[in-house]
């Protein structure tokens, strides 16, 4: 069984990257799809856990979309303190922990 962080998770469908705020502890993982259509100006994060705000991170405006799980530099996130990582093989993915 792979180790899963208690406050981060990945979405159950396809490869995905979980973005968690690194400057404060949040029990709820904010999950973004690993891919998205071109020419999109707004990413809508979704909470994997059934928790009320402030667990949910507000909308993040970016100039373009990119593959989060890739080696390419992430555009448009200067000034935002984020930590990204991929959790493969979690048995109970996105299980509510509140």
UniProtKB/Swiss-Prot annotation:
Positions carrying N-acetylalanine are 2
Per the record, which residues fall in region 4 X 5 AA repeats of C-C-X(3)?
Answer: 3-59
Q: Which UniProt keywords apply?
A: Acetylation, Keratin, Repeat
User: Its Gene Ontology molecular function terms?
Assistant: structural molecule activity
**Residues in coiled coil:** none
GO CC terms in record: cytosol; keratin filament
The sequence repeats are at 3-7, 8-12, 47-51, 55-59
Describe the family membership recorded for this protein in Swiss-Prot or TrEMBL: Belongs to the KRTAP type 3 family.
Query: What's the protein called, per UniProt?
Result: Keratin-associated protein 3-1
Q: Which gene encodes it?
A: KRTAP3-1
């Amino acid at each position: 069984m792979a180790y899963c962080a208690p406050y981060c998770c990945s979405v159950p469908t396809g490869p995905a990257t979980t973005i968690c705020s690194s400057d404060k502890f949040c029990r709820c993982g904010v999950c973004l799809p690993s891919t998205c259509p071109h020419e999109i100006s707004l990413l809508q994060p979704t909470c994997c856990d059934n928790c009320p705000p402030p667990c949910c991170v507000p909308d993040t405006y970016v100039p373009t979309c990119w593959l989060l799980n890739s080696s390419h530099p992430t555009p448009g996130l200067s000034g935002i303190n984020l930590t990204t990582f991929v959790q493969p093989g979690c048995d109970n993915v996105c299980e509510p922990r509140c």
